Amino acid sequence: MQTIYTKITDIKGNLITVEAEGASLGELVQIERADGRSSYASVLRFDARKVTLQVFGGTSGLSTGDKVIFLGRPMEVIYGDSLLGRRFNGTGKPIDREDECFGEPIPITTPSFNPVCRIVPREMVRTNIPMIDMFNCLVKSQKIPIFSSSGENHNALLMRIAAQTDADIVIIGGMGLTFVDYNFFVKESQRLGFADKCVMFIHKAVDAPVECVLIPDMALACAERFALEQKKNVLVLLTDMTAFADALKEMAITMDQIPANRGYPGSLYSDLAVRYEKAVDIAQGGSITLISVTTMPGDDITHPVPDNTGFITEGQFYLKDNRIDPFGSLSRLKQLVIGKKTREDHGDLANALIRLYADSRKSAERMSMGFKLSNWDKKLLAFSELFEARLMSLEVNIPLEEALDIGWKILSQSFHSEEVGIKEQLIQKYWPKACLHK
């Protein structure tokens, strides 16, 4: 049932206040202006008869006498195969200059998937990036962010992951993107050959902040339907969650909410968690794997956005100096696949490589301070150069099995077999034969 009101009592930023009854949170509202234009809004808060609405597209040209029509349903997005290869804005309208998209309208705010129907993650998602596949495995239905330092090319990493995984559908949610970023996503998806199975929901930096908040909900609502009804394995890429949090912050300040840490709303943790919890592996169905980008202002990992994110997600990839830092990265689900879905030497070899690389960092520090280096220090430094060039560089693009073989070769070129701390049975089986008695 639609209800029409014509008394707007307050206009502040992209928010308006209307005296109305019977409104519900998230309800979609249509605003008809005196000049014939119309726009949409959603219910953000209500207090007795005062209902606060967030207006999509801004409040410019709005007057207090315009018609406000409560539509009696939540914000919706179109779902169906017609979405594939298309691009939409924060209100669900096409921005790719193609025809209108037709399909089933679905609400964008739904509860997380029923835990009874979830299954324990058990399948590895291969990316051909050694620092992920070898040391911090990505697991199907995992929710994991990329913590990115300033100036890092995290968008290129996202697109590479999207192109090299076996996901049936890729859904990209871009928030606060510049035109250069948006154009990069479009061109790269075409160049890498997955544009036809990709859906993009894009909020540009010039768009209203309230539309930014809707992007993750739209992307995840469509992903959930694809996974549940069509049993598709969906990869959802969200960037940048710091822009999403900043939009929440701006809206909270406009509504005169009492700020919490660094001005962000006290609900920041819940606002992030309700999106990340959409990641799921469905029994006898598909899956949703969620990778997000969280930029760290000032490279500060204690900033409220990465700090709260770390408590919600199942690890993180720490992107720094154009490489994934092994010491700041973690996958809490890797033990579910290492040695079970991968080669038997995977766990021991990865642990040995990281341990020796950590020791090499100490040797490099001693060298920088002018200390005399031992033969062991020199071995570690030689190993470090090989490790960084052949496994850590983001230019490396090889399958996991080849990365494991390269790991053994690096060890054999730098150390004796008894110096690496790996079980003898694995040494006998995988250590390069020409170097076995080195």
Swiss-Prot record:
GO biological process, one term: proton motive force-driven plasma membrane ATP synthesis
Keywords, sorted A to Z: ATP synthesis, Hydrogen ion transport, Ion transport, Transport
Pfam families (alphabetical): ATP-synt_ab (PF00006), ATP-synt_ab_N (PF02874), ATP-synt_VA_C (PF22919)
SUPFAM superfamilies attached to this UniProt entry: P-loop containing nucleoside triphosphate hydrolases
One annotated GO molecular function: ATP binding
Function: Produces ATP from ADP in the presence of a proton gradient across the membrane. The V-type beta chain is a regulatory subunit.
Family: Belongs to the ATPase alpha/beta chains family.
PANTHER family: V-TYPE PROTON ATPASE SUBUNIT B
HAMAP family for this protein: ATP_synth_B_arch
Name of this chain's protein: V-type ATP synthase beta chain
